[in-house]
């Protein structure tokens, strides 16, 4: 189970960074309108 927890933490970090990137993308596209 300890290994699984590590994998879940890694996936959470990846998801978090993807969400931040998407938010930045939308923010910039709205600012350019």
From Swiss-Prot:
Please give the PROSITE patterns that the UniProt record associates with this protein: BACTERIOFERRITIN (PS00549), FERRITIN_LIKE (PS50905)
Give this protein's Gene Ontology molecular function annotations.
ferric iron binding
Residue span, Ferritin-like diiron domain: 1-33
Gene Ontology terms: biological process: intracellular iron ion homeostasis; iron ion transport
User: Does the entry feature the keyword Iron, yes or no?
Assistant: yes
Main function? May perform analogous functions in iron detoxification and storage to that of animal ferritins. Contains approximately 750 iron atoms per molecule.
- What's the protein name? Bacterioferritin light chain
Origin species: Absidia spinosa
